[in-house]
Regions:
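Internal alpha-helical transmembrane segments of multi-pass membrane proteins, especially GPCRs
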Residues: 6-10
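Ser/Thr-rich, Proline-interspersed low-complexity disordered segments
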Residues: 30-49, 426, 435-441, 446-461, ...
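A surface/extracellular/periplasmic glyco- and lipid-processing/surface-interacting theme
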Residues: 34, 40, 44-96, 101-430
Length: 481
């Protein structure tokens, strides 16, 4: 009898539980023999993505002609106003611009494949602030001459034949005419603005010197958006766009960008919404802005979807005041900007030792560096590494009210003497603290005093710093791949 009561009690409890879980308006029914069981749809398996095969410099998918297993190539290109227009810059996958001596800037175009470069130049001497950016990637580095600091880096890191010191069999174009109608043949243009090289000469250098161009890259230069997803990162929807730090909004307008490298050298970008790219311009000694063009590509204007600006301390190397050789601090990182699609986003960057790769990060809400790598949209990039002293002059705005016709400052390169090269100078030689016999492996230093270089009159003397650059060379580090 007790068992029967327990069974009845259990049945009543189950009925109450079912009634309590029943949603309003639901009815509980018992399936009959004629009822059809509900169909359960299988969850589709996630689509398997193909292997990630991205161009190391742009993040774009590799094409059929991608130079698999080949080193990237970097070339030093003159950017003093008298050297413009340049050749080959439109072929660059990444274009670096950094201040060198006298307040002028220099370019370092970086190419995925040297065989597609065509003609490039005017080629100029190597500087360590550029070399340290490509050292982790073990790029072929092409220049004409080098500073003593650059020479020492090549020795310390055993760069050997990857440090080419003669413009890769460079040649002189004595008849080239610059933007102002001046030429060496007419006696109105310095020899330094006449050195060029090309794909064939680079190939001949590699072949004749048995340069090892084999290199497998296991990561891309930046943390690019995955091309396989078919998406683009909209900076307006950035994870940082919801807050402002003490310096203002993290994401703001960037249709117009103006970067001040020194009192005499500026670069600006104008956003073209129809092409989703930035057009590049620079200021000239006559007070005008002009498009930055590639005269080897029918004066094609340089454009970039990605514009990256990195601020850091730049000062004269102690003991090199006469030449005003510039030291760029990479050890500590700093604030920068990533501009894309007419917007500019504040970021944090780090590098560290020469063997560590450049890294970009989102900011935390307190303005400090986060641990989240910045996603860069695929495509070509312009990268400026510029003096933090000019950070407050960085302009990023809408195009409303921007005067696109004239410059706000002039360049003063007329008061700056780069080199005192002679017409009979051996190709590849330079008065940048080296003799014509220097090969980049460090055998020779000059026995004669280098040509005196002056800073622009309106800029004043370069700031001196008695603190020697920190030793950045861990003995057990190997280059990143």
């Amino acid at each position: 009898m007790k068992r029967v009561l327990l069974v009845i009690t259990a049945l009543l409890s189950l009925t109450v539980l079912l009634a309590a879980c029943k949603k309003s308006g639901d009815t509980i029914s018992t399936p009959t023999a004629e009822s059809t069981p509900a169909t359960v749809e299988a969850t589709p398996a996630p689509t398997e993505l193909p292997p990630y095969e991205a161009n190391v410099l742009t993040g774009e998918p590799k094409g059929a002609d991608y130079p698999e297993g080949q080193r990237i190539t970097a070339v030093m290109v003159n950017n003093i106003v008298a050297a413009r227009p340049q050749r080959g810059l439109s072929k660059a996958d990444i274009l670096f611009e950094i201040k060198v001596e006298g307040g002028i800037t220099r370019f370092m175009p970086v190419f995925t494949d040297y065989k597609t470069v065509g003609e490039v130049g005017p080629v100029r001497s190597g500087r360590d602030q550029f070399f340290r950016l490509i050292l982790p990637w073990q790029a072929l580095y092409i220049h004409e001459g080098q500073s003593v600091v650059m020479q020492q880096y090549a020795i310390d890191y055993d760069y050997g034949k990857l440090n080419n010191n003669d413009g890769a069999n460079g040649y002189r174009d004595y008849g080239r005419v610059n933007w102002a109608g001046k030429s060496y043949n007419a006696g109105s243009l310095a020899l330094e603005h006449t050195m060029y090289t090309n794909s064939d000469n680079i190939a001949n250098y590699i072949s004749s010197q048995n340069v090892d161009m084999n290199r497998t890259y296991n990561s891309t230069f930046f943390n690019f958006v995955d091309y396989r997803l078919g998406t683009t990162r909209d900076l307006s929807n950035s994870l940082d766009s919801a807050y402002s730090d003490k310096y203002g909004p993290v994401v703001s307008d960037g249709q117009y960008i103006e970067i001040e490298h020194s009192q005499s050298y500026k670069t600006r970008f104008i956003y073209d919404e129809s092409a989703n790219e930035y057009k590049m311009q620079q200021n000239y000694s006559d007070g005008q802005w002009r498009d930055t063009v590639d005269e080897a590509a029918d004066n094609k204007v340089l454009t970039f979807p990605n514009v990256i600006v990195l601020y850091t301390d730049i000062h004269t190397y102690p003991g090199h005041e006469a030449k005003d050789l510039q030291y760029v601090e990479y050890a500590w990182g700093g604030i920068g900007y990533y501009c894309y699609g007419g917007k500019c986003e504040k970021i944090y960057w780090q590098k560290g030792t020469p063997l560590e790769a450049l890294r970009l990060y989102y900011l935390n809400e307190d303005g400090t560096c986060s641990d989240t790598p910045l996603e860069v949209n695929i495509g070509k990039s312009y990268v400026a590494v510029t003096d933090v002293d000019f950070a407050e002059n960085f302009v990023h705005s809408t195009l409303d009210g921007v005067n696109l016709s004239t410059a706000t400052t002039q360049t003063y390169e007329k008061s700056y003497v780069e080199d005192d090269a002679k017409a009979g100078e051996t190709l590849g030689s330079s008065t940048d603290d080296l003799t014509a016999a220097a090969t980049g492996s460090g055998e020779a230093e000059t026995n004669e005093a280098p040509a005196q270089e002056k800073t622009p009159a309106d800029e004043g003397a370069p700031a001196e710093n008695t603190e020697a650059p920190a030793d950045e060379t861990p003995a057990d580090e190997t280059p990143a791949e």
